[in-house]
Swiss-Prot record:
One of its GO terms (biological process) is ATP synthesis coupled electron transport. It comes from Anthoceros angustus (Hornwort). GO terms for cellular component: chloroplast thylakoid membrane. Coiled coil: none annotated. Belongs to the complex I subunit 2 family. This is NAD(P)H-quinone oxidoreductase subunit 2 A, chloroplastic. It comes from the Eukaryota.
Length: 500
């Protein structure tokens, strides 16, 4: 393979956002080795690199699709939205880590390195176009997530969560790799996604039993990363045991990266096997919506409740993936953008509450409104938006997602989604009711000893700043849903692999 300076620059420009983050990792390591008063600069470099990376990605959205590194990486508007979403989620999660590290006195450098490495892995995964790059970047994201989940080494629950996540994650990765090896063999030794599709057509393997076996392995591997039923067993334990700020991070980033991977593989490699993977994914999505919401009702831990809530939420996302057209993908991405604000806003609120009280029990939130009306209001708005209460952003996002699913003929999935959304409102409203409980009615000692917060509007606390941004997004972004949809649809129309 012949390389020249011009092609090197062209290829490098396509991954410039990731290169910026890699450079920030090197700078962070150097600062950690050379500077004593390093805390400010570590956070400054991390946040600045993410902002610059997002800015570069915004400019790349307008460009024509580009295949770089001999076709191994694809840059287009579709995966650009996913890359921006991952970088933006990390940008909102760093303030959560700042507050958590300050209160728990944990090492800052390692936390930021793992977080940025996971971000880089997720962003590369969104544009990966061959099996080797997909697997390497997926493992980069996964390994960093394992390390983050067990970061509080003195916490037994955190160690248990990391071990379960590692073992289950390793098993799912090996299943996915096995599916990839079948694809490689059946396609005649091809590794790039479009070439695999062409190879399967040429070898007339699409009607064989082997393709069904490949689909089962690949769906199982991706379903684990997305916490879809029945591959969700690790999720509640990891959510409960890992640091809350860490859970906030990979509850969003891993799902965004997983959705990007699912859409790219199913819409490219298995485009001629629509009936097979549509049926399997629809069954998994329906099970996720039902089990996630019904089991969430019984939970007493806030983090476990959010774990099952996230399982049901990813079931809703799958409606857009199963639709398999530009409208379905546009609705999925629109809801994903709203979900970032809703989910991170909720996790930011419970992170702050946990740092001030040291409890995760749902009952201990009783009477919070009397002690901290702003935090209580922000948490209530985020939860209600997750439930899809109008006129919050979650309502408009779900409405558009279900409408596109209905148009695509997914009547059963949409009906189940509507029914389970009503169920989810029950357990979200139950928490809101506890929050506004009158003092001394059902309040516990945690709330009675709770220290009233300062004014959020003038607060210098980074986590409170993240809360404000997320709550504004989850509350008011639904108002501008039409412009958001128009931008997403226009961006998707420029992508080369979307089949209308």
């Amino acid at each position: 393979m012949k390389l020249d300076f011009g092609s090197f620059l062209s290829d490098g420009s396509s991954i410039l956002p990731e290169c910026i983050l890699i450079s920030s990792l090197i700078i962070i390591l150097l600062i950690d080795l050379t500077s004593e008063k390093k805390t400010y600069w570590l956070y400054f470099i991390s946040l600045t690199s993410l902002i610059i990376s997002i800015t570069v990605l915004l400019f790349q959205l307008k460009e024509e699709p580009i295949f770089s590194f001999s076709g191994s990486f694809q840059t287009d508007g579709f995966n650009g939205i996913f890359r921006i979403s991952i970088a933006f989620s990390s940008l909102l999660c760093i303030p959560l880590s700042m507050e958590y590290m300050k209160c728990t006195k944990m090492a800052i450098t390692e936390s930021l390195i793992f977080l940025l490495t996971a971000t880089i892995g997720g962003m590369f995964l969104c544009g990966a176009n061959d099996l080797i790059i997909i697997f390497i970047t997926l493992e980069c994201l996964s390994l960093s997530s394992y390390l983050l989940s067990g970061y509080t080494k003195k916490d037994v629950r955190s160690n248990e969560a990391a071990m379960k996540y590692l073992l289950m994650g390793g098993a799912s990765s090996s299943i996915l790799a096995y599916g990839f090896s079948w694809l490689y063999g059946l396609s005649g030794g091809k590794i790039q996604l479009q070439e695999i599709f062409n190879g399967l057509i040429n070898t007339q393997m699409y009607n064989s039993t082997s393709i069904s076996i490949v689909l089962i392995f690949i769906i199982a591997g991706i379903a684990f990363k997305l916490s879809l039923v029945p591959f969700h067993q690790w999720t509640p334990d990891v959510y409960e045991g890992a640091p809350t700020s860490v859970i906030a991070f990979f509850s969003v980033t891993s799902k965004i990266a997983g959705l990007a991977l699912a859409t790219r593989i199913f819409n490219t490699v298995f485009f001629s096997s629509l009936n097979e993977w549509h049926l399997i994914l629809e069954i998994i999505a329906i099970l996720s919506m039902i089990l996630g919401n019904f089991i969430a009702i019984t939970q007493t831990s806030m983090k476990r409740m959010l774990a099952y809530s996230s399982i049901s939420q990813i079931g809703y996302f799958m409606i857009g993936v199963i639709a398999g057209d530009s409208n379905g993908y546009a609705s999925m991405i629109t809801y994903m953008l709203f979900y970032i604000f809703m989910n991170l806003g909720t996790f930011a609120c419970i992170t702050l509450f946990g740092l001030r009280t040291g409890t995760d029990n749902i009952r201990d939130y009783a009477g919070l409104y009397k002690k901290d009306p702003l935090l209580a209001s922000f948490l209530a708005l985020s939860l209600l938006s997750l439930g899809g209460i109008p006129p919050l952003a979650g309502f408009f996002g779900k409405l558009y997602l279900f409408w596109c699913g209905w148009k695509a003929g997914l009547y059963l999935s949409v009906s189940v989604g509507l029914f389970t959304s009503v169920i989810s409102i029950y357990y979200y409203l139950r928490i809101v009711k506890l929050i506004v409980t009158k003092e001394n009615e059902e309040t516990t000692s945690y709330i009675r000893k709770y220290k009233t917060s300062s004014n959020y509007l003038v607060s210098k606390s980074p986590i409170e700043f993240s809360i404000i941004i997320c709550v504004i997004g989850s509350t008011f972004s639904g108002i501008v849903i039409n412009p958001v949809i128009a931008i997403v649809e226009k961006t998707i129309s420029l992508s080369s692999f979307i089949n209308n």
